[in-house]
Amino acid sequence: MAEKVLMKGNEALAESALRAGCRFFFGYPITPQTELAAYMSKRMPKIGGTYLQAESEIAAINMVYGAASAGARAMTSSSSPGISLKGEGISYMAGSDLPGVIINVQRGGPGLGGIQPSQSDYWQATRATGHGDFFMPVLAPSTVQEMADCVYRAFDLADEYRTPVMVLADGMLGQMMEPVVLPEPKESLPEKPWATTGHKGKRAHNIVNSLYLTADALEKLNIERFERYEVIREKEQRSESFMLDDAEIVVVAFGASSRVARSAVVAAREEGIKVGLLRPITLWPFPTKAIEDALSHAKAFLSVEMNMGQMVDDVRLAVNGRAAVDFYGRTGGVIPTPEEVLSAIKDSAKRGGVL
């Protein structure tokens, strides 16, 4: 029977990862995700796993690379500036087709920024986590329950597609407490015949590597990898719709900002405005199919974010000039209020000819 408990978001992430079969965690303390690492330091040894506080974020991601190469389910976590330091290692994992899970509990930036919640790493997560030609699935929870659900799913995605996967949370979700139904522990994990555990006469000699010195070989592998990305784009788009069936104004928001946007949508409906919420759960692949469905009745889209305007680029690409696209955001760790978003909805409605 599933267990329901009251937990912080960071702790729910950690416990769910353990139940997903994660037995190697390598981290480094940074606000606002330190509780995740602290929880792992207590729980991991009790279940026969390995917790190691690395000497740096760079070391931590390369330890994930090593554990993943040996076929283990491994994870690291950090917050915005720490994720930047992990970028090279994430690229190496992508180039070696290694599964692993990276948690980013975002804070304000750029630079050292602040310790308040932010969503300013959207571009980094979906476009430029590291150098080279690669993508990785990015999941965006909006509740403590989804913090648990997303990391549980992330390990399966990582193994299925042999890719790093990121859970993009934020300091608000990491620090808040809500009831969460924890998933059942996985009883079996997929076999990984490619892992460096000895071939035992069952396969050819194998080296896990991202270095290819001939251009043709590297191009061939990149093309094969992008064919896999197309499968992910087709099969793994996830989103949630709220009051969207007849919406003429579609608010698009993810993570913590979607909670605020939801309240604003309810308030706008009470004033007679036909507005709904589209909440991307996968940021990559972006839920273009849901945008396409909404275009059958939407006259305008409003992207609400805790940054200066990043996801709005993907909204514009998906809409492709067929409706107006507006943006409202707060930055630096400031959380928008429902009243602010309601005002932005009314402005979009006027520009879209709805009011």
Predicted regions and their residues:
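Conformationally flexible catalytic loops at phosphate/diphosphate-handling active centers
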Residues: 162-241
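Redox- and metal-dependent alpha/beta enzyme cores, enriched for Fe-S-associated oxidoreductases
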Residues: 239-278, 284-290
